[in-house]
A protein has these predicted regions:
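Compact soluble domain cores
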Residues: 31-49
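Short secondary-structure junction/hinge motifs that connect adjacent elements
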Residues: 37, 51-58
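Enriched for short, Lys/Arg-rich terminal
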Residues: 1-9, 15-32, 49, 56, ...
Length: 93
């Protein structure tokens, strides 16, 4: 179980990193929103902004947070790391 004092590292899958770079290039407002949500996720992986929710079915074990009405951040959490797997669209591409 994660405690409040745990400091988690962030990693991106290759696809998620490309999506982040695309947001950085095309939509600075969304980039700032993503950065804010990532920072909050580091502090509180399962609560906080973006309405965190555990995913089900083929994405069981992952969590999502709303970036806006169309896009979600999908991520997994271990005892040492938050891995971001998706930053565009709604769960499945």
């Amino acid at each position: 179980m994660l405690t409040q004092m745990t400091r988690l590292n962030i990693s991106f899958t290759q696809d998620a990193w490309q999506e982040y770079l695309a947001w950085k290039k095309d939509d600075r407002k969304m980039e700032k929103r993503i950065d804010k949500i990532i920072s909050d996720t580091i502090r509180h992986p399962f609560t906080g902004i973006g309405k965190p929710e555990p995913l089900q079915h083929n994405l069981s074990g992952f969590w999502s947070r709303k970036l806006n009405s169309e896009h979600r951040m999908v991520y997994g959490v271990t005892s040492k790391e938050i891995q971001i797997v998706q930053l565009k669209y709604h769960y499945d591409k």
